[in-house]
């Protein structure tokens, strides 16, 4: 944890190194993730994370939130796209998503909304619908 300071840059307090649960904010929703290596200021309570730990923590929190909401995980979204033989860009055109949306869903850096999740499930569960939409959208 080289990048975690020993002195808090906010208040000057001592930063304690800990391994334990942390709350991670995902769009205003707090997700508790256990066993996280981090630093916490003994005076003001500010938390500090190594950048690599923060990235893993964020992805883990997204996966946990997807599971809690009953959303498809990134691995299933990728499997669906690949089963249709589409690139990420072509899949985005098919479903009307913005650039780089699918890669973010697939690597669990963001979660899809319920409407998008429902569309993904329809494409997965009804191949005829997927084929018809592909013919109309992608030519």
Roles of regions detected by a PLM:
Residues 51-115:
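Extended interfacial segments that mediate partner engagement and assembly in macromolecular machines
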Residues 2-71, 122, 126-139:
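N-terminal flexible/basic segments that precede or flank functional cores
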Residues 97-139:
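A generic hydrophobic-segment detector
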């Amino acid at each position: 944890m080289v990048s975690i300071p020993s002195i808090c840059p906010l208040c000057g307090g001592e930063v304690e190194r800990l391994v334990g649960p942390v709350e991670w904010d995902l769009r205003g929703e707090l997700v508790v993730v256990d066993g996280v290596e981090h630093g916490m200021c003994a005076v003001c309570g500010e938390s500090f994370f190594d950048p690599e730990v923060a990235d893993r923590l964020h992805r883990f929190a997204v996966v946990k939130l997807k599971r809690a909401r009953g959303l498809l995980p990134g691995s299933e979204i990728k499997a669906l796209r690949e089963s249709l033989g589409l690139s990420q860009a072509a899949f985005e055109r098919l479903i009307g998503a913005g650039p780089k949306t699918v890669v973010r869903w697939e690597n669990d850096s963001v979660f899809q909304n319920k409407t998008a999740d429902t569309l993904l499930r329809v494409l997965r569960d009804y191949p005829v619908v997927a084929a018809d939409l592909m013919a109309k959208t992608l030519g």
